[in-house]
Structure formats: C-alpha cells, structure tokens
Amino acid sequence: MPRKSVLDFAKGRGAYVWITAYDYPTAKAVDEAGVDGILVGDSLGMVLLGLPNTLGVTMEDMVRHTEAVARARPRALVVADMPFMSYETGPEDALRNAARLVKAGADAVKLEGGTEYAPIVERLVKAGIPVMGHIGLTPQRFLTIGGFKMVGKTEEQRRKILEDAKALRDAGVFSIVLEFVPASLAREVTQAVDVPTICIGSGPHCDGQILVLHDVVGLTERPPSFAKKYADVAAAIREAVSKYAEEVRKGLFPAREHYRE
C-alpha cells in the first residue's frame, strides 16, 4: 500500500488511529498493526529516558528518534514533536528546527499552543512543512497550567480552546490534537473546525484517537487514567529475562545448538 500523506487526513473518513513510536522496531511493529499515524513524541523523555517531564527533551533527541522511526519506512504518516523552546523564540528558529525534523524523515511536525503560535504555524505551512496542532493540556506548559490535569472545565478555558482551534485551523494545520479536555468540549471543537481532531483523554467525539505506545503495551509504571493497557509487555520481559538468567546460572544456556566449536 502507498505511504500516507497529510492529504489522507480529512473529516468523514472514519476514525483515525494514532500511536507513539520512538525507534525502528516499535515503528515497524505499530505500522504493521495498521495505524494511520505515528507520533515521534517528546514524551520519549518520560517513557524512554526517565525524565520527570518533557522540558528536558532536545532537538538532538527528536532528530535521532525521528531518524530511527523513519528507517522503518512506515506506511503510516510520521509526525515529529517540536520540543520545548525549539519554536517559541520566533518563526525563523521554528522553521530551522522544523526543517531538521523533516530532513530526519518526518512527514509533518507537531507543536503545542494555540492562538499565540498561529503565526509560527502559518510560517511553517507556507514553507511547505505540514503542521499538526496540539491544544488543551499542553505538557510543555505544565508549569503555567498547574500540572498535568484536565483543561477546559471553566467557561473561560472552553472559550480559549475553541478560539485556539479556530486560529490553528486558519493558520493551516492539517489536524489538531485535543489532550485531556472534557468530552463535551472535544465534541464542540470537532464540530467547529473542518480539520480532523485527534483525542487523547478527551472522549469519543473526535475524528481519531492517539495514545502513548508504552501505556498501551503495559510498559508505563503509572499510566494516565485515560489510557488503556492492551498487553503486559513488562511482565513478558521479566518472565523471559528470568528464564534466561536461570538457564545461564544452571549451565543450560548456551546449549549445543547455540554455538560452534
């Protein structure tokens, strides 16, 4: 099947399935599972590197992991996160950094923020770089929103998120992630814009869903309440490594078929 492009994402084409991946083998696996989009998320800082938040993720981190995912040559669309302070300093810095991610193999970039970053989105789109928006809970701004909690419960917040969605739409995003907002607000935003909305922790009314792979397969110690675990890979790893350790200590591995004289 041909690789997907941003033109394949539009309203009314079913529910889009997105998931994160950060390296070659997981990108290959999730693509073979049939997802529509792969996000090389700055969440890698927390789920891979053990950081307490995403603020410490660098452009070098994002370029390296985007390259790894792109080497899997996935059919799915590959979107790379723009990390903290890679675009906030102005349109030209944003363009330079977004171009690095595209050269690393991303089909598009994602950036957090609403109306205030619409000019940056517009600059990137005019330069030929597709952009996915991200509003609601924006993890790079957890210090200013009081932590990792639901956003959009007050009338002021709801109005701001709606304004943000429309501003991003007008700036040219091809899609918008809505993170951890009330389902009723996600439905309102989805009805208000003509680009696909992708929910994470925001209910069933968006045009698609996205989750962090490590939450889905059971590799996260404390997954968010809105995630669902579909497998327990951590338990499988513990079991496999325990058996390996036991066989080494008992002299059962390597067996004759595992080596040559």
Curated annotation (Swiss-Prot):
Name the UniProt key words of this record, in alphabetical order: Coenzyme A biosynthesis, Cytoplasm, Magnesium, Metal-binding, Transferase
Question: What remark does the entry make about the cofactor?
Answer: Binds 1 Mg(2+) ion per subunit.
Any one GO biological process: pantothenate biosynthetic process
Q: Which GO terms describe its molecular function?
A: 3-methyl-2-oxobutanoate hydroxymethyltransferase activity; magnesium ion binding
Q: Which InterPro entries match?
A: Pantoate_hydroxy_MeTrfase, Pyrv/PenolPyrv_kinase-like_dom, Pyrv_kinase-like_dom_sf
Q: What is this enzyme's class at the first EC digit? A: transferase
Q: Does the keyword Coiled coil apply?
A: no
| Catalytic activity entry | 3-methyl-2-oxobutanoate + (6R)-5,10-methylene-5,6,7,8-tetrahydrofolate + H2O = 2-dehydropantoate + (6S)-5,6,7,8-tetrahydrofolate
Residue positions annotated to bind 3-methyl-2-oxobutanoate are: D42, S43, D81, K110
Pathway named in the protein's UniProt entry:
Cofactor biosynthesis; coenzyme A biosynthesis
Highest taxon of the lineage: Archaea
- A Pfam family (short name) is Pantoate_transf
Query: Main subcellular localization, coarse class?
Result: cytoplasm
TM region(s), chain numbering = none
Localization per Swiss-Prot or TrEMBL: Cytoplasm
Q: What GO CC terms are in its UniProt record?
A: cytoplasm
> Which family does the UniProt entry place this protein in?
Belongs to the PanB family.
The record describes the protein's role as: Catalyzes the reversible reaction in which hydroxymethyl group from 5,10-methylenetetrahydrofolate is transferred onto alpha-ketoisovalerate to form ketopantoate.
* Protein name (database record): 3-methyl-2-oxobutanoate hydroxymethyltransferase
The record lists the lineage as: Archaea, Thermoproteota, Thermoprotei, Thermoproteales, Thermoproteaceae
